């Protein structure tokens, strides 16, 4: 599968490549890259056939957008790429510094347009649910921005499934443009979205765009029980905080080393078992653990494009190579089994076997159309 195996994003005519370039690290110091490195990464992605670029207003305090605006303008690439940015997280102080209200979205979007040196955004993501803005207001705001030509499409991230379902239902009933894609944490280490978000996306014609498919580096093969348990704390502070302190990470300093907001949830017995299986599949196939983990994500139901965040050009090349991997049925089954999330009581009622016998009286019933 080459990078030029383009696909539509959701039920729309927006065409994207199978990997999306995430630029959260553009402009950061500790965990990312400065302008020359970011330019090289951007160029390598475009040369590989990629056309989908993702950023946000808060990434590197706006520096990520500024860099992208320059790269795109200098390369005369605006018409050939799909440019996505986000709003929702606070970019300052005060109640209107963030959120999903019309006031903040419009203000944030205008600032993003200036930094990106463009007059429209192809895909505007709602970055996070604010828990207070009515779905009706958010939908009307996004529809108005589409009508005004400020954005072409919109999607949503880090938001409860019930709220997204309400947005999508209102959009259909009112004849307004609804969200076409969902951006969520999805990897072998975390498959929580499979219970609600994946089937909801299929029902409403939305694509899944996974972020952190390597689980913040956990699935790259850099970590194991012994090294984590024996390691002395390093890189104190959250990655975002450390990145703003102007420090360049030391050689060998990894994303999950030392104090960080992810280790407690990722360094678990379940994930060590996933890594053991991933390592075994890697040894049997000759592919790196990272490539196998990426291949697994890209082949999951509903996934149209997968975000890759990189800090070196070589990582672009390695990630793209994962598109050519086709895992055997046995290897796929092994990874699926070891990474299967614990089934909640409610969802155990929806398993095919129970549905066949307890609901349809022993008959096999298939749904042919979404």
Pin down the residues of each PLM region:
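Terminal-tail/helix-coil boundary detector
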Residues: 2-3, 203, 226-284, 299-304, ...
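Conserved, mostly hydrophobic/aromatic
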Residues: 9, 21, 38, 53, ...
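Short acidic capping loops at alpha-helix termini that bridge into adjacent secondary structure
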Residues: 17-18, 76-81, 85, 119-123, ...
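Active-site beta-loop-alpha junctions enriched in small/polar residues
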Residues: 24, 56-58, 86-90, 126-129, ...
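Generic structural signal for well-ordered alpha-helices
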Residues: 42, 65, 69, 109-113, ...
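Structural motif corresponding to the early beta-alpha repeats
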Residues: 75-100
């Amino acid at each position: 599968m080459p990078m030029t195996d383009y696909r539509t994003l959701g039920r729309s005519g927006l065409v994207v490549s199978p990997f999306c370039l995430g630029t959260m690290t553009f402009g950061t110091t500790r965990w990312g890259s400065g302008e020359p490195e970011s330019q090289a990464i951007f160029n390598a992605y475009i040369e590989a056939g990629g056309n989908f670029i993702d950023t946000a207003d808060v990434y590197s305090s706006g520096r990520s957008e500024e860099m992208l605006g320059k790269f795109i303008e200098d390369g005369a690439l605006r018409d050939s790429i799909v440019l996505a940015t986000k709003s929702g997280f606070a970019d300052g102080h005060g109640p209107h510094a963030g959120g999903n209200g019309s006031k903040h979205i419009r203000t944030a979007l205008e600032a993003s347009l200036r930094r990106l040196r463009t007059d429209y955004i192809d895909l505007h993501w709602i970055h996070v649910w604010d828990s207070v803005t009515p779905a009706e207001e958010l939908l009307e705001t996004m529809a108005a921005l589409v009508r005004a030509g400020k954005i072409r499409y919109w999607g949503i991230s880090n938001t409860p499934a019930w709220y997204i379902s309400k947005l999508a239902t209102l959009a259909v009933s009112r004849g307004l443009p609804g969200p076409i894609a969902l951006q969520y944490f999805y990897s072998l280490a975390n498959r929580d979205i499979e219970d609600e978000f994946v089937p909801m996306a299929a029902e409403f014609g939305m694509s899944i765009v996974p972020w952190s498919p390597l689980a913040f580096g956990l699935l790259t093969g850099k970590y194991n029980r012994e090294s984590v348990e024996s390691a002395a704390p390093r890189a104190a502070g959250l990655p975002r905080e450390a990145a703003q302190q102007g420090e360049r990470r030391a050689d060998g300093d990894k994303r999950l080393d030392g104090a960080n907001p992810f280790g407690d949830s990722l360094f678990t017995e379940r994930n060590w078992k996933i890594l053991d299986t991933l390592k075994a599949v890697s040894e049997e196939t000759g592919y790196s653990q990272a490539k196998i983990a990426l291949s697994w994500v890209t082949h999951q139901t509903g996934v149209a494009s997968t975000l890759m965040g990189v800090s070196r050009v070589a990582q672009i090349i390695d990630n793209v190579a994962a598109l050519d991997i086709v895992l055997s049925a046995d290897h796929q089954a092994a990874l699926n089994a070891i990474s299967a999330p614990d089934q909640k009581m409610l969802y155990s009622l929806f398993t095919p076997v129970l549905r066949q016998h307890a609901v349809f009286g022993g008959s096999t019933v298939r749904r042919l159309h979404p």
